[in-house]
Regions:
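C-terminal motif of bacterial Sec signal peptides marking the signal peptidase cleavage site
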Residues: 12-16
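Extracytoplasmic low-complexity, Pro/Thr/Ser/Ala/Gly-rich segments
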Residues: 27-96, 196
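Short, well-ordered beta-strand segments enriched in hydrophobic/aromatic residues
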Residues: 99-110
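The feature marks short-to-medium sequence segments in extracytoplasmic or secretory-pathway proteins
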Residues: 108-157
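Surface-exposed edge beta-strand/loop patches
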Residues: 18-19, 152-196
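Hydrophobic core residues within well-ordered beta-strands of beta-rich domains
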Residues: 67, 99-101, 162
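Bacterial N-terminal signal peptides that target proteins for export
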Residues: 1-5
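Bacterial Sec signal peptide processing site at the extreme N-terminus
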Residues: 19-29
């Protein structure tokens, strides 16, 4: 029966529906892209491999938890990856290709946090300005070469890190332009431009 049901995948587009409301302290600013002036709180653009500032958990179970995200590598998949993933074709929205983002999640302080609570704010920005959240798979798991699904329920204590790979689906013909880390409604996202 599961083979006939197929996998149902939802790629959520970011349309301002981040429910974090984290209330983080720091300077709001106008989102200036100048990273040379001011403190590290104002820096918005990073190189792949560069750690984010500490982020506060938006989950009630770990509300005092703080963590960092370090996107390290971005790779665009192929049509064959998509065909072999186990996902049904989405004829309504056109063909998609996967983009894989490897990141290191590091729990810095506070209550133990689940891996899924630390990577759920990652966003893929395309060269056309489109933004897509990570692929959420229901009723079966998608399979990607060299990008295993992370154990989202694994808990990390302060000082522990986990290397994860996250898959995003973007329209075929578009390119990955940047990995973004959403910081809620009122703060500009952090960005790691893709240079390849």
């Amino acid at each position: 029966m599961p083979a006939t049901v197929g996998a149902l995948a939802l790629a959520l587009a970011v349309t301002g529906c981040d429910d974090s409301g984290s209330g983080k302290r720091g300077k709001g600013g106008s989102g200036s892209h100048s990273s040379a002036s001011g403190g590290s709180d104002e820096k918005k653009t990073y190189r792949l491999g560069e750690e984010s500032p500490e982020q506060e958990s938006s989950k009630t179970t770990s509300k005092d938890g703080k963590y960092t995200v370090t996107p390290t590598k971005v790779e665009t998949g192929t049509k064959a990856d998509m065909e072999n993933s186990g996902l049904k074709k989405d004829d309504k929205n056109g063909p998609k290709i996967p983009v894989y983002v490897w990141s290191t999640l590091t729990h810095k302080s506070g209550t133990a946090m689940e891996v899924g609570d630390m990577d759920d704010k990652l966003v893929m920005k395309t060269n056309t300005g489109g933004r897509t959240r990570a692929l959420i798979v229901l009723m079966g798991a998608a399979k990607w070469p060299n990008c295993p699904e992370p154990d989202s329920s694994k808990k990390l204590s302060p000082g522990q890190s986990e290397k994860v790979c996250t898959a995003f689906l973007i329209p075929e013909g578009q390119k990955a332009a940047a990995v973004e880390l959403s910081q809620g409604y009122y703060k500009a996202p952090l960005e790691w431009p893709v240079t390849n």
